Amino acid sequence: MARGDLLRDEEIAAALGRLAGWQQTNGALRRIYEFADFRGAMKFVHRVADLADAAGHHPRIEVKLHRVTLTVTTDADGGLTQRDIDLIRRIDG
């Protein structure tokens, strides 16, 4: 499978079985992270930003006080690709 190829439903289901806390929604994968405070949430966001820059692939990030929601998809390809799974593994690694 080429990096830009959209994942098939069974590939997404298999990946979700190995990605704790992630859910599929509207052609993307989403996870909510909770932290003790805003500072902890922002430290996490900065770490995600570093990983995303290194990968050249960036999630949507929403911060609400101590809660961070990440949404990962490959907009250019119109859905989920291996790049998304790879980024999630780096974030959760």
Regions found by a protein language model. Give the residues of each.
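Short arginine-rich
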Residues: 21-24, 49-59
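Short amphipathic alpha-helices within nucleic acid-binding modules
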Residues: 39-45
